[in-house]
């Protein structure tokens, strides 16, 4: 991915961090330094998240003991930085704690082999054993009264359990952001637990926090995947495009500085350096608030908030207004006769400036699209600057962008129209059929999860103003497809999925969109037990009922990959009527037992 090399020269000139944010040499004890910077509450929360993300099976009580031991040790080092072991790196201290856990091999198998390694290999080994799909039961929210009682009796323990349960299910969750969501959780409970109808107050508010947190989890996993697979340069390119969209009035040097710092912070969190990551994120927020004049006119409201809220607010900040007097981008990058000379003399800066200039003019594009355009521009210059008449060759490059722009625009239009016609559940089913046909080898639970998440794009994005739809849709789809890739990589079963997941991150969504029905797939045999249901479905929450039905739908498609829309509609309609009828019957069990085989026979016949 040489097209992201533009940042090389700019790294040398440094950033806010190189001017003194990170001065490790000034601190004899890294852990004392982080404890003093973060404060005890945030320090303990981050240590709990770190242990929960590494050792995902350990109960809360065991992790809390480790957290207290690390906190007590940090306090010792704050009092005397020369005390024994205070000069050790945080990775060494944490790794030693993990490796001292009794029965580590019994509970975690090969992870125990990491303990034979030295740092930094030991930490790398721990990271490789993080499980994106741990075998943990779905998190069940307690009843409102019980939740409030537990919260009011011991708020610290209650919120600690929240951090533990989320972190161990999402081992790459952005740690300082998870602290923010715990803070929001605390606010909701503090407000609602004094209400007469606690459930009515809690449910919608906690649902909203949960939805935002789940989206944050998949977005951060994509960032870590990008870092792991393609390195820091690819991530920095993403950051330059995103920052240029948000802060179009900032100079290129400022944008590059911010992008470099954001990359460093994300690398730390993805690498398990949660204390450093959170500390540096707070420093970046401080820098941005001290330099509002050169960044954006929209920052002030964020800068008045406490540290966690400030950083989160800055991360979600609305785009600043685009300068009114921006010249045509063609002037410097197409019409200038010195384009090839400028490109050859400083490719890094020239391509970086192009990405910056194009991105600041297009807040209505997704970051993935902007990076595809930058890639196209570089490929054009590489080709044309080697020819006899370069200006004639690259003169049409901006027009050649049009097909790349139209493809995601058409995707948004088609899918939003389908969503408006079918609603969220119907749209999820359409996506499920589409992806089961593309990759029928993928496990049904994974397909159902992916389709349900992909299907939510309509609710999230299709109601937004036109200018916000494309970036919302494509950036959200990219994050969800990354989750599919992460799960598939663990147990690869589809060559098509492997191909899309192995290529460039910015080409991944178009790759999946272009997949067609897998002609090599041998249909599954029709098994009656797959479509046999019992009365327990009647008492399931609506979400669980939907998942049961969608599981059956995916299995139908695997049995008949080329089934028509009408065939599937007939079978699923028949199934819905069957469930509705038997759930209303006086003798539900008898109804399911007698009507079930008839349903199976009709379904088999309809799909013949």
From Swiss-Prot:
Q: Which residues carry this modification: Phosphothreonine?
A: 444, 446, 570
What processing steps or modifications follow its translation?
Phosphorylated by FAM20C in the extracellular medium.
According to the UniProt record, which cysteines are disulfide-bonded?
77-86, 99-115, 114-125, 148-193, 192-201, 224-270, 269-277, 289-303, 302-313, 340-385, 384-393, 416-462, 461-472, 485-501, 500-511, 538-583, 582-591
Q: Name one GO molecular function term.
A: toxic substance binding
* One Gene Ontology cellular component annotation held by this UniProt entry: protein-containing complex
Where the record annotates domain Albumin, the positions are: 19-211, 212-403, 404-601
Please list the residues that bind Cu cation: 27
Q: Which residues carry this modification: N6-succinyllysine?
A: 460, 543, 588
PROSITE patterns per the UniProt record, alphabetical: ALBUMIN_1, ALBUMIN_2
Name the organs or tissues of expression. Answer: Plasma.
Q: What does the entry list as the binding residues for Zn(2+)? A: 91, 271, 273
Q: Where does Ca(2+) 1 bind?
A: 30, 268, 273, 276
Keywords, sorted A to Z: Calcium, Cleavage on pair of basic residues, Copper, Disulfide bond, Lipid-binding, Metal-binding, Methylation, Phosphoprotein, Repeat, Secreted, Signal, Zinc
In the record, Phosphoserine modifications are located at 29, 89, 297, 443, 513
The propeptide segment or segments lie at: 19-24
N6-methyllysine is found on 558
Query: Which proteins does it associate with, and in what oligomeric form?
Result: Interacts with FCGRT; this interaction regulates ALB homeostasis. Interacts with TASOR. In plasma, occurs in a covalently-linked complex with chromophore-bound alpha-1-microglobulin; this interaction does not prevent fatty acid binding to ALB.
PANTHER family according to UniProt = ALBUMIN, SERUM ALBUMIN-RELATED
Instruction: Give the family this protein belongs to, as stated in its UniProt record.
Output: Belongs to the ALB/AFP/VDB family.
What this chain does, per the entry, is described as: Binds water, Ca(2+), Na(+), K(+), fatty acids, hormones, bilirubin and drugs. Its main function is the regulation of the colloidal osmotic pressure of blood. Major zinc transporter in plasma, typically binds about 80% of all plasma zinc. Major calcium and magnesium transporter in plasma, binds approximately 45% of circulating calcium and magnesium in plasma. Potentially has more than two calcium-binding sites and might additionally bind calcium in a non-specific manner.
- According to UniProt, the name of this protein is Albumin
